[in-house]
Amino acid sequence: MDSLLMKQRKFLYHFKNVRWAKGRHETYLCYVVKRRDSATSFSLDFGHLRNKSGCHVELLFLRYISDWDLDPGRCYRVTWFTSWSPCYDCARHVADFLRGYPNLSLRIFAARLYFCEDRKAEPEGLRRLHRAGVQIAIMTFKDYFYCWNTFVENREKTFKAWEGLHENSVRLSRQLRRILLPLYEVDDLRDAFRTLGL
């Protein structure tokens, strides 16, 4: 586990949603864990992690939360803000993990979409997460602002958007929507059949 707050430069470098993210070989994951009790929720923990040699950050988080004694009678919501979306293998592990914890929900807000050489694997991993009930979205100004005020040693400086933040968020959101679109269409079809009583 890293220190509780990130340095400003590290956050801006790793989370910047630039089109070409050369040299950004680490993945950072900021997280919030909440327990939901009826209409209210309680923050249990927050912090950030980064990948370690030989272990992706998503798997580090799964190891971390596996050590908790999660009460099966309570609902938990985990929110991740990641510098890269999960690779296929991590997506598979996360989906499998969530199957064992039906009382835990996960939301992922990614700064950038990760694709390696096999451009079909990572999109399939994102679809697998979506099928497992994970809410996946691209970070917007609001998410960066929240992260800046929650996870960054900001010395009371206000978060300032960089040039292209909004445009890149829109572009990446469209790309993510195209990846998940077949699943949305199936969901829409199911809802239509349900409405018709079929």
UniProtKB/Swiss-Prot annotation:
Positions of the CMP/dCMP-type deaminase domain: 23-129
Tissue: Expressed in thymus, lung, spleen, kidney, small intestine, lymph node and tonsil.
The enzyme's E.C. designation: 3.5.4.38
Modified residues (Phosphoserine): 38
Residues with the Phosphothreonine modification: 27
Motif (Nuclear export signal): 183-198
Catalytic activities: a 2'-deoxycytidine in single-stranded DNA + H2O + H(+) = a 2'-deoxyuridine in single-stranded DNA + NH4(+)
Cellular component annotations (GO), alphabetically ordered: cytoplasm; nucleus; P-body
Region named Required for interaction with RNF126: 88-116
Alphabetical keyword list: Cytoplasm, Hydrolase, Metal-binding, mRNA processing, Nucleus, Phosphoprotein, Ubl conjugation, Zinc
Family annotation (CDD domains): cytidine_deaminase
Residue positions of motif Bipartite nuclear localization signal: 1-30
GO molecular function: cytidine deaminase activity; RNA binding; zinc ion binding
Region of interest: Important for interaction with CTNNBL1: 39-42
Pfam family, one: NAD1
Record: active site: 58 (proton donor)
Enzyme superclass (EC): hydrolase
Subcellular location field: Nucleus; Cytoplasm
Cofactor requirements of the protein: Zn(2+)
SUPFAM superfamilies given in the database record: Cytidine deaminase-like (SSF53927)
Function summary: Single-stranded DNA-specific cytidine deaminase. Involved in somatic hypermutation (SHM), gene conversion, and class-switch recombination (CSR) in B-lymphocytes by deaminating C to U during transcription of Ig-variable (V) and Ig-switch (S) region DNA. Required for several crucial steps of B-cell terminal differentiation necessary for efficient antibody responses. May also play a role in the epigenetic regulation of gene expression by participating in DNA demethylation.
Protein name as it appears in the record: Single-stranded DNA cytosine deaminase
Lineage: Eukaryota, Metazoa, Chordata, Craniata, Vertebrata
